[in-house]
Design a protein with these regions (language model features):
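Elongated, amphipathic alpha-helical interaction scaffolds
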Residues: 1-299
Length: 299
């Protein structure tokens, strides 16, 4: 560890926030191009030399309060001026992630302007970084999904991709994943101590830069405050989702268990995406208001 940069020499003990905190993730990727390039290289399984340019298309003003448009902290990237990448970190399981991620992908894919030719639509790749297993019956560390013919496996198009990185399944990383150190990047996301960060950071320069940047921004009060706000927000969401599921079970007694739970879960997700936490709390306890919103949103 003697050759390790001095910025982390005195760091020890628990980290204040893990990289699964989406504000911290967004800050680190936006602050350090070396980290962003290394991470994208690992996710796409391509060499860093193949990455000629990376542009964040939805930058935020770091350290300032988020407005409603920025509340969902997905990272939109333009790779080499000809490929759109959307990366999102998600800790909570909404039970609707396939539909939700597909919606995000479709929005990003719809990049044509009036008068553009359809052939010019950018290849688009949505990458979900999850702290839960999407398909427990088919666990994978990193999976990529595309449109193809179910009989002969002919690709319909290579311009439409969905990938999922499961932070709970690092032990299932393939040799290809390990070749691009995606397993170490995943380990960095779930590292709980500075000692863990230092050990992982020795594996490559981008990982070292990531550890340095996490340490540096964690010392900035305005960044810490917003990381804490996001942590509390996620805790509130977890509580509200649990409450909503319990209410959904009650409704399910009369309209069918799965239908009742799914209906309320969809409403809660919709309200959370609009940052309407007060309304989320209300719908879990106010049946009349809940039915009013069901009708309003055709649920």
């Amino acid at each position: 560890m003697a050759n390790f940069t001095s910025i982390l020499d005195e760091a020890s003990g628990p980290v204040p926030y893990q990289l699964t905190n989406d504000y911290l993730f967004r800050t680190v990727m936006q602050k350090n191009q070396t980290v962003l390039k290394g991470f994208v290289s690992a996710l796409l399984h391509i060499s860093e030399e193949e990455i000629r340019s990376l542009e964040i298309m939805n930058p935020i003003v770091l350290g300032e309060d988020l407005d409603s448009k920025e509340f969902i902290l997905d990272l939109k990237i333009l790779l080499n001026s000809n490929q759109a990448i959307n990366i999102e970190v998600q800790v909570l399981n909404y039970d609707d992630w396939p539909e939700r991620s597909l919606t995000y992908l479709c929005r990003a894919f719809d990049s044509l302007k009036h008068g553009d030719d359809y052939i010019d639509v950018l290849p688009t790749h949505h990458i979900s970084i999850l702290k839960f297993t999407l398909f427990p019956q088919h666990p994978e560390f990193y999976s990529t999904n595309m449109l193809m013919n179910v009989r002969n496996h002919q690709l319909y198009t290579g311009k439409f991709q969905l990938s999922v990185l499961d932070l709970n399944k690092i032990h299932l990383a393939t040799e290809e994943d390990k070749k691009y150190q995606l397993d170490y990047w995943a380990a960095l996301f779930v590292a709980k101590t500075w000692e863990d960060f230092k050990m992982i950071a020795e594996k490559s320069e981008p990982l070292k830069e990531a550890a340095k940047t996490v340490y540096a921004v964690s010392a900035e009060e305005d960044i810490r405050l917003r990381c804490e706000a996001r942590r509390r927000y996620e805790e509130d969401r977890a509580f509200l989702i649990t409450s909503g599921r319990k209410q959904g079970i009650k409704e399910g007694k009369s309209i069918g268990f799965q239908e009742g739970e799914a209906k309320l879960s969809s409403l809660i997700t919709l309200l959370m995406e609009q940052n309407r936490l007060d309304d989320v709390k209300r719908v879990t306890s106010d049946l009349a208001y809940r039915r009013e919103l069901y009708e309003k949103y055709n649920l």
